[in-house]
Design a protein with these regions (language model features):
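Flexible hinge/switch segments at interdomain interfaces of large molecular machines
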Residues: 10, 54-62
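Generic secondary-structure signature for well-ordered alpha-helical cores
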Residues: 3-7, 39-43, 60, 90-95, ...
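General beta-strand structural signal in soluble alpha/beta enzymes
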Residues: 47-51, 96-98, 111-112, 124, ...
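Helical element adjacent to the flavin cofactor pocket in flavoenzyme catalytic cores
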Residues: 28, 34-40, 62-121
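Dinucleotide-binding Rossmann-like beta1-alpha1 core, especially the glycine-rich loop
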Residues: 1-52
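Generic structural signal for well-ordered, non-membrane alpha-helical segments
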Residues: 26-30, 48, 74, 78, ...
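N-terminal FAD-binding dinucleotide-binding subdomain shared by FAD-dependent oxidases/monooxygenases
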Residues: 32-40, 47-55, 76, 85, ...
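Active-site substrate-recognition segment that forms the wall
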Residues: 3-12, 102-107, 116-156, 160-188
Length: 188
């Protein structure tokens, strides 16, 4: 869609590194996940284990235990994607109603403070506000996600960090830690 519609959202398909970065238990957990993926029929081209030396070719970490890598991941700049998708669907005649608080919804109908909208398809893209909608509240799982981004980093710094091919990364701990190199050379 982004290619067909010409949406500039900094799309980069560099894969993702799930890193065992701090504890040997992380390595055991990731290797167990890899066995589960193999049991599902996903092969070496889909997910592969990287020993510390191989991981260091992609991301330089202090004393890692290894990583699980999949090429099937891309990063984007989400605000640019949303603006591009909005332009695309509006050009098709779709009307977007922003700042419209949803009071209730059911299949085919959304009721807002300003009125009701009927549609064949309803996408409840409400993120953290799902609890206020009875049909969704019971399915909500609260997740906190924080993001910090550096200023654009010089090439010398990136040579020390890695991530030359646009890979995203994550650490295999209970507290979700993840990041990427942005198109304008920030570490986010």
């Amino acid at each position: 869609v982004i290619q067909r519609e010409g949406i500039d959202c900094d799309y980069r398909k560099g894969g993702v590194l799930y890193c065992a970065a701090r504890y040997p238990e992380q390595q055991a957990s990731l290797r167990e996940q890899l066995q589960g993926l193999r049991a599902l029929g996903l092969g070496e081209a889909d997910y592969r284990w990287l020993e510390p030396a191989e991981l260091a070719k992609q991301l330089r970490l202090a004393n890692p235990y290894g990583a699980l890598f999949t090429p099937h991941c891309a990063t984007i700049q989400p605000a640019r994607l949303v603006r591009g998708l909005a332009r695309c669907v509006e050009s098709m005649g779709v009307e977007i109603y922003e700042q419209s608080r949803v009071l209730d919804w059911q299949p085919g109908l959304v009721r807002t403070a300003q009125g009701s909208v009927r549609a064949d398809w309803i996408v409840p893209a409400v993120e953290g506000y799902a609890a206020s909608l009875p049909p969704l509240g019971r399915y909500q799982l609260p997740v906190q996600s924080l993001l910090v981004a550096t200023e654009p980093l010089p090439a010398e710094t990136w040579a020390q960090i890695g991530l030359e091919r646009g890979q995203a990364f994550s650490e295999a701990s209970r507290q979700v830690t993840y990041g990427q190199r942005t198109a304008d050379d920030r570490l986010a």
